[in-house]
Amino acid sequence: MLAKRIIPCLDVRDGQVVKGVQFRNHEIIGDIVPLAKRYAEEGADELVFYDITASSDGRVVDKSWVTRVAEVIDIPFCVAGGIKTLEDAAQILSFGADKISVNSPALADPTLITRLADRFGVQCIVVGIDTWFDEETGKYHVNQYTGDESRTRVTQWETLDWVREVQQRGAGEIVLNMMNQDGVRNGYDLVQLKKVREACRVPLIASGGAGTMEHFLDAFREANVDGALAASVFHKQIINIGELKAFLAQQGVEIRVC
């Protein structure tokens, strides 16, 4: 059995790490490189960086900090933000990223997933899915351009349909960003995760809602996700990564303990 992964997420805007609640009202957390180094030293299995306004601004991720991150950490990291071409992806990978993630650009042009997978291999192509539960309809829908709340829009895709679509097109991993739970710290949406897990044959990463160590445990035990991503509990030092991994190991979760 592959070890489960603990993945801090760093949302980047204007060269700094920020964090919002339900993808809104972002506050500045700190500088990118020191935070990345801290998480690597605490025992994170990998890091994910989202340049959250790149797609809505019509630009690609600022590549200058990618090189600096690669110089100070020795764990894998994934970069996302406005990657629309093979050239964009190649440059980010050449600067030291291990994976690239696409989200809004893939919704605009789903063939991008296949072209990236064919060129670089499925192992380094991640698809991020920003999913919102509509209480009126009882359905989960995929949202686009979520880094800028003034430009966010609901797409035609229901979440499970898009999960199936991106796998067919070559996604090597899926990060499910559950917007209703984002930053609230009341736990992951286990109901949604279980549904997506049934439809997902590639590694699945849960994102949105972690507030306690037990929330991570629930995601691994009940939804059988491959990794759990979180931001605010790590940024605000509510949970220490090393202590979290020790707790999970004590509970019988297969996890890499430093």
From Swiss-Prot:
PANTHER family: IMIDAZOLE GLYCEROL PHOSPHATE SYNTHASE HISHF, IMIDAZOLE GLYCEROL PHOSPHATE SYNTHASE SUBUNIT HISF/H IGP SYNTHASE SUBUNIT HISF/H. It catalyses: 5-[(5-phospho-1-deoxy-D-ribulos-1-ylimino)methylamino]-1-(5-phospho-beta-D-ribosyl)imidazole-4-carboxamide + L-glutamine = D-erythro-1-(imidazol-4-yl)glycerol 3-phosphate + 5-amino-1-(5-phospho-beta-D-ribosyl)imidazole-4-carboxamide + L-glutamate + H(+). The active site is at residues 11, 130. Keywords: Amino-acid biosynthesis, Cytoplasm, Histidine biosynthesis, Lyase. InterPro entries: Aldolase_TIM, His_biosynth, HisF, IGPS_HisA/HisF, RibuloseP-bd_barrel. This is Imidazole glycerol phosphate synthase subunit HisF. It is found in: Cytoplasm. Pathway: Amino-acid biosynthesis; L-histidine biosynthesis; L-histidine from 5-phospho-alpha-D-ribose 1-diphosphate: step 5/9. It comes from the Bacteria. Heterodimer of HisH and HisF. It holds the Pfam family His_biosynth.
